[in-house]
């Protein structure tokens, strides 16, 4: 077991998780990013995550599993694990009430704007933080596994997840600041919601450690690819397009794919 790889993977996960704190800083400074920038950045994240999932992570899972179970068995196992990852994150997504679900951006704002009392604003912020923490847990596992796999994959994935964590931090910090008048409390809750990602990495590592081998790694890679694809299509792309900058989001998506492709080609 190479502890330097484990530390590297965990550091990337911590970096991605703490990006919610960046969102908190933006919220308390009352300087929100423009719609064009947000659409392009989220679209870029979608491009990176989709491309790396289908071109690098899923094929690597097939390679690991076919080495154990043969071509037919390995391909079936990788496909099953891929859709199991999608099912896992979809179930988590459905368990979170719509009004506080960070994957339902159109309802979050309306719910928060409808609260007239500070106590309800505080409750909205805390519940949003809890909801985001639930969603960030498997994302942390995904980033961690990518870090164990290959830095070429891990760094762009961590950056992509960090980008989409920034608006989540804003969603937590805004109602808490309005409720308490405290920038410190708003920033604290925004940052804490992102710490679920390194927690996901730790739990994933503890669960995987006794089973580290081609089977466990191959199944994990495929499941992580499924998780990343679902997050991209269910959360990031709709959020980017909902800004009203449809073409900017798509240009960002293509740009993310192109950057990811070039970064992989440079290391062949």
From Swiss-Prot:
Q: Which InterPro entries does this one have? A: ZIP, Zn_transptr_ZupT
Q: What GO cellular component term, any one, is given?
A: plasma membrane
- Specify which residues bind Fe(2+) according to the UniProt entry for this protein: 136, 139, 165, 168, 197
Q: Which GO terms describe its molecular function?
A: metal ion binding; zinc ion transmembrane transporter activity
Keyword list, A-Z: Cell membrane, Ion transport, Iron, Membrane, Metal-binding, Transmembrane, Transmembrane helix, Transport, Zinc, Zinc transport
Q: Which residues bind Zn(2+)?
A: 139, 164, 168
Q: Which residues cross the membrane?
A: 6-26, 37-57, 73-93, 126-146, 153-173, 189-209, 211-231, 248-268
**In what way does this protein cross or attach to the membrane?**
Multi-pass membrane protein
Compartments, as annotated in UniProt: Cell membrane
> What reactions does this protein catalyze?
Zn(2+)(in) = Zn(2+)(out)
Principal place where this protein is found? membrane
The record describes the protein's role as: Mediates zinc uptake. May also transport other divalent cations.
The record's comment on protein family reads: Belongs to the ZIP transporter (TC 2.A.5) family. ZupT subfamily.
What PANTHER family does this protein's entry cite? ZINC TRANSPORTER ZUPT, ZINC/IRON TRANSPORTER
Q: Which HAMAP family match?
A: ZupT (MF_00548)
Provide the protein name.
Answer: Zinc transporter ZupT
Give the originating organism.
Corynebacterium efficiens (strain DSM 44549 / YS-314 / AJ 12310 / JCM 11189 / NBRC 100395)
Q: Which gene encodes it?
A: zupT
């Amino acid at each position: 077991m190479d502890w330097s790889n484990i530390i590297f993977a965990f550091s990337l996960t911590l970096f991605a998780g703490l990006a919610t704190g960046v969102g908190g800083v933006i919220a308390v400074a009352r300087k929100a990013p423009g719609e064009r920038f947000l659409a392009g950045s989220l679209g870029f994240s979608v491009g990176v995550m989709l491309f790396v999932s289908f071109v690098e992570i899923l094929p690597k899972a097939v390679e690991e599993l076919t080495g154990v179970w043969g071509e037919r068995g390995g391909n079936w196992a990788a496909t099953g694990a891929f859709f199991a990852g999608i099912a896992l994150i979809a179930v988590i997504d459905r368990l979170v009430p719509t009004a506080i679900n960070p994957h339902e951006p159109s309802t979050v704002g309306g719910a928060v704007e409808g609260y007239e009392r500070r106590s309800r604003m505080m409750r909205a912020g805390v519940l949003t933080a809890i909801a985001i923490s639930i969603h960030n847990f498997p994302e942390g596992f995904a980033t961690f596994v990518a870090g164990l796999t290959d830095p070429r994959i891990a760094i762009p994935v961590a950056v992509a997840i960090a980008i989409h964590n920034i608006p989540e931090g804003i969603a937590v910090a805004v109602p808490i600041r309005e409720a308490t008048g405290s920038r410190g409390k708003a920033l604290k809750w925004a940052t804490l919601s992102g710490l679920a990602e390194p927690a996901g990495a730790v739990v994933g590592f503890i669960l995987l450690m006794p089973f580290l081998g081609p089977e466990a790694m191959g199944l994990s890679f495929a499941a992580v690819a499924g998780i990343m694809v679902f997050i991209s299509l269910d959360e990031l792309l709709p959020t980017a397009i909902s800004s009203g900058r449809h073409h900017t989001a798509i240009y960002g998506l293509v740009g993310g794919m192109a950057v990811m492709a070039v970064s992989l080609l440079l290391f062949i």
